[in-house]
Amino acid sequence: MSQAPNRLTPFFENIEFERNDGKMILNFGPQHPSAHGQLKLVLELDGEKVVRAMPEVGFMHRGIEKMAENMTYQEFIPVTDRVDYIASVANNYAFCEAVERLCEIKVPRRAQIIRVILLELNRISSHLLFLATHALDIGAMTVFLYAFREREYVLDMIEKYCGARLTHSAVRIGGMPLDLPEGWFEEMLKFCEKFPKDIKIYEDLLSENRIWKMRLENVGVISKELALSSGCSGVMLRASGVKWDIRKEQPYLVYDEIDFEVPYAVAGDCYARYVLYMREMKECVKILKQCERLYRASSREILADAPEFVSPSKEQIMTQNYSLMQHFVLITQGIKPKRGEIYFASESPKGELGIYINSQGEASPYRLKIRTPSFSHCAIYEDLLVGQYIADIAAIIGSTNIILGEVDR
């Protein structure tokens, strides 16, 4: 008779296993270098093949959605940094955009362009971390070092804008806190000229490497049907033959004015996902280059003129008494959107990042729900890992590019 699950009984003790001397139960993680966070997998093996896989999550659960109900909308922005802490601008933006749509705030054009620039730099940073750790899992130490070297340039640029390298809090409700510093664009364009050459170096080292292809081709195949039924998005969905990118299908910011391609593949294996991440970084460079023309042609406003919801600029706060009072009220009492609900989805580096807010007209959301791509991509392990060799588990997990801060929230 199985033991009834309760909050004190560990997850794996509630799983029924048939006694079979030909099978073995293996705990993968939660302290495993290839788990990319506190992920635990209970694997049932028949020889070297996985016949059953059960992901156990929750080690990094912080109750972020409940925290939002006890914080003002402005106070919650730094918390969004900790969802996907590898691409925090994507989280900042998705939350702020949802609040702006709820409050019907029109964000100035220059602020929208700066958001696109930071989002694409964040995408490159996230993809480089994927490439570095994925290569290291399979034994390619050189690519790990090269990718981290280039990632430093990206983090340095973001740091020069907002002062933080990882948890940026770079977006504000109603716009952006700062314009781009003098000389910043020139540095970014210099990076955009150099980075495609670096990508080619990665591809020369990996794409036709015999060992790399043997480890990734026809491994961890996700069919189109499985990807759709499991709620996959981003590269995980596009690698399985579904050409879907929210930036193209439901454009936001100024993405509808930018020319870029949506790479996709049909193989659905680890190698296809690797190829798409490489191609996406090239598209990010194309987007960043086009943003210069849009930025130069835009007016200097970076904060919306909505006194009920948006604080004045720092210069106005320090020089105008009315602006100081307005800022004091907004910060101490918080903004109060009208009653209603909103769901906004954006294309984060890992897939569809959605924010649902239910407002009852108070300074804190009545309910906030974060739809993270990594949660769906982790849930697919129960189907994806069955039939795979134990030696391929690290490669498959790496190719799904999950982050446990997103999974557990």
UniProtKB/Swiss-Prot annotation:
It is a peripheral membrane protein. It is an enzyme of class 7 (translocase). One of its GO terms (cellular component) is plasma membrane. Signal peptide: none annotated. Belongs to the complex I 49 kDa subunit family. The gene is nuoD. It catalyses: a quinone + NADH + 5 H(+)(in) = a quinol + NAD(+) + 4 H(+)(out). NDH-1 shuttles electrons from NADH, via FMN and iron-sulfur (Fe-S) centers, to quinones in the respiratory chain. The immediate electron acceptor for the enzyme in this species is believed to be ubiquinone. Couples the redox reaction to proton translocation (for every two electrons transferred, four hydrogen ions are translocated across the cytoplasmic membrane), and thus conserves the redox energy in a proton gradient. InterPro entries: NADH_Q_OxRdtase_suD, NDH1_su_D/H, NiFe-Hase_large. Keywords: Cell inner membrane, Cell membrane, Membrane, NAD, Quinone, Translocase, Transport, Ubiquinone. NDH-1 is composed of 14 different subunits. Subunits NuoB, C, D, E, F, and G constitute the peripheral sector of the complex. The keyword Cell inner membrane applies. Its EC number is 7.1.1.-. GO terms for molecular function: NAD binding; NADH:ubiquinone reductase (non-electrogenic) activity; quinone binding. This is NADH-quinone oxidoreductase subunit D. It comes from Campylobacter curvus (strain 525.92). It is found in: Cell inner membrane.
